[in-house]
From Swiss-Prot:
Keywords: Isomerase, Isoprene biosynthesis, Lipid biosynthesis, Lipid metabolism, Magnesium, Metal-binding, Steroid biosynthesis, Steroid metabolism, Sterol biosynthesis, Sterol metabolism. Isopentenyl-diphosphate delta-isomerase; part of the second module of ergosterol biosynthesis pathway that includes the middle steps of the pathway. IDI1 catalyzes the 1,3-allylic rearrangement of isopentenyl (IPP) to its highly electrophilic allylic isomer, dimethylallyl diphosphate (DMAPP). The second module is carried out in the vacuole and involves the formation of farnesyl diphosphate, which is also an important intermediate in the biosynthesis of ubiquinone, dolichol, heme and prenylated proteins. The active site is at C111, E176. The keyword Ligase does not apply. It catalyses: isopentenyl diphosphate = dimethylallyl diphosphate. InterPro entries: IsopentenylPP_isomerase_typ1 (IPR011876), NUDIX_hydrolase-like_dom_sf (IPR015797), NUDIX_hydrolase_dom (IPR000086). One of its GO terms (biological process) is isopentenyl diphosphate biosynthetic process. This is Isopentenyl-diphosphate delta-isomerase IDI1. The lineage of its organism: Eukaryota, Fungi, Dikarya, Ascomycota, Pezizomycotina. Pathway: Isoprenoid biosynthesis; dimethylallyl diphosphate biosynthesis; dimethylallyl diphosphate from isopentenyl diphosphate: step 1/1. PROSITE patterns: NUDIX (PS51462). One of its GO terms (molecular function) is metal ion binding.
């Protein structure tokens, strides 16, 4: 990673990003031929970080997800929601074919980014957790039609952060500090087909069986979380989860 914490006091602007990453790829050519709505969403402004999760700038979703920029060290903030029903079944989604990154792959309930807006940006861990919870409410409604009233802010539980990097197709990829959020709720779905192709609820046993099915493809971050921590957390969902909450250290994957 080429950034250092010495830059964290700079104003969070596009101009500061160009100073930090003078060779950053800002071209629009990679978006040619993709779905119009997904192209529009690539203009959303993500929070760019140093390796300690301190905001150092902003950049569009497109810029953050180009492998040419990821290979230069560009890192951004993200979140992953794991929503369980009252049977402790986990809601999965299959990403839509229209998605530019990781299309058609199965993943956890919702995976996205807090935006550089006052309600979702934070420089302290406490403020950052609050920001990703608000972002999670926003995206659960956008992707799955889940109303905020069914997923109250105070019902989200923050577990930890993971820092990982994963290519998608050679052109696109992920390099994120990902906030892991659990919530238990029975919800009504109204799927946005431009975002989500399918959904299903799984048990730990059925999910492990699906991992052995070569016809099913899962996102790399979901597999990382499953292979390292998820099943232990899941086992303690109703009793004992407290000891896993609010981890301060970033897990490097």
């Amino acid at each position: 990673m080429s950034t250092t914490t010495t830059t964290t006091n700079q104003p969070i602007t596009a101009e500061s990003m160009l100073r930090l990453f003078p060779d950053i790829d800002t071209s629009s050519a990679p978006l040619s031929g993709h779905d119009e709505e997904q192209i529009r969403l690539m203009d959303e402004v993500c929070i760019v970080l140093d390796e300690d999760d301190k905001p150092i700038g902003t950049a569009s979703k497109k810029i953050c997800h180009l492998m040419t920029n990821i290979d230069k060290g560009l890192l951004h903030r993200a979140f992953s929601v794991f929503l369980f029903n009252d049977k402790n079944e986990l809601l999965l989604q299959q990403r839509a074919t229209e998605k530019i990154t990781f299309p058609d792959m199965w993943t956890n309930t919702c995976c996205s980014h807090p935006l550089h807006i006052p309600t979702e940006t934070g420089s302290t861990l406490e403020d950052s957790i609050a920001g990703v919870k608000r972002a999670a409410q926003r995206k659960l409604e956008h992707e799955l039609g889940i109303k905020k009233e069914q997923v109250p802010f105070e019902d989200f539980h923050f577990l930890t952060r993971i820092h990982y990097k994963a290519p998608s197709d050679g052109m696109w990829g992920e390099h994120e500090i990902d906030y892991i959020l659990f919530i238990k709720a029975n919800v009504d779905l109204d799927i946005n087909k431009n975002e989500v192709r399918d959904t299903q609820y799984v048990t730990p046993e059925s999910l492990k069986q699906q991992f052995d099915d070569p016809s099913l493809v899962f996102t790399p971050w979901f597999k990382l979380i499953c292979n390292s921590m998820l099943f232990e957390w899941w086992q303690n969902l109703d009793s004992g989860l407290d000891k896993y909450l609010n981890e301060q250290e970033i897990r490097r994957m």
